[in-house]
Amino acid sequence: CIANRNGCQPDGSQGNCCSGYCHKEPGWVAGYCR
Protein backbone atom coordinates (compact mmCIF):
# COMPACT_ATOMS: atom_id res chain seq x y z
CA CYS A 1 0.00 0.00 0.00
CA ILE A 2 1.03 3.64 -0.32
CA ALA A 3 2.49 5.27 2.80
CA ASN A 4 1.15 8.52 4.25
CA ARG A 5 2.29 11.70 2.45
CA ASN A 6 3.10 9.73 -0.71
CA GLY A 7 1.32 10.42 -3.98
CA CYS A 8 -1.95 8.74 -4.90
CA GLN A 9 -5.09 8.98 -6.99
CA PRO A 10 -8.52 8.77 -5.29
CA ASP A 11 -9.70 6.26 -7.93
CA GLY A 12 -6.98 3.82 -6.84
CA SER A 13 -5.23 3.81 -10.23
CA GLN A 14 -1.84 4.24 -8.54
CA GLY A 15 -2.58 1.81 -5.71
CA ASN A 16 -4.32 2.05 -2.37
CA CYS A 17 -3.28 4.16 0.60
CA CYS A 18 -2.34 2.25 3.76
CA SER A 19 -4.66 4.65 5.62
CA GLY A 20 -7.41 4.07 3.09
CA TYR A 21 -7.67 7.80 2.38
CA CYS A 22 -6.23 9.72 -0.57
CA HIS A 23 -6.58 13.49 -0.12
CA LYS A 24 -6.92 15.34 -3.42
CA GLU A 25 -8.19 18.89 -3.87
CA PRO A 26 -9.73 20.41 -7.01
CA GLY A 27 -7.07 21.40 -9.51
CA TRP A 28 -4.45 19.01 -8.16
CA VAL A 29 -2.89 16.60 -10.64
CA ALA A 30 -2.39 14.06 -7.85
CA GLY A 31 -3.35 13.68 -4.22
CA TYR A 32 -1.50 12.33 -1.21
CA CYS A 33 -2.24 9.67 1.37
CA ARG A 34 -3.04 10.77 4.89
Curated annotation (Swiss-Prot):
Keywords: Antimicrobial, Disulfide bond, Fungicide, Knottin, Secreted. GO terms for biological process: defense response to fungus; killing of cells of another organism. Disulfide bonds join C1-C18, C8-C22, C17-C33. Pfam families: Antifungal_pept (PF11410). Signal peptide: none annotated. GO terms for cellular component: extracellular region. It comes from the Eukaryota. InterPro entries: Antimicrobial_C6_CS, Gurmarin/antifun_pep, Gurmarin/antimicrobial_peptd. The keyword Isomerase does not apply. It is found in: Secreted. Belongs to the AMP family. Has antifungal activity against C.glabrata. The presence of a 'disulfide through disulfide knot' structurally defines this protein as a knottin. This is Antimicrobial peptide Alo-2. It comes from Acrocinus longimanus (Giant harlequin beetle). The lineage of its organism: Eukaryota, Metazoa, Ecdysozoa, Arthropoda, Hexapoda.
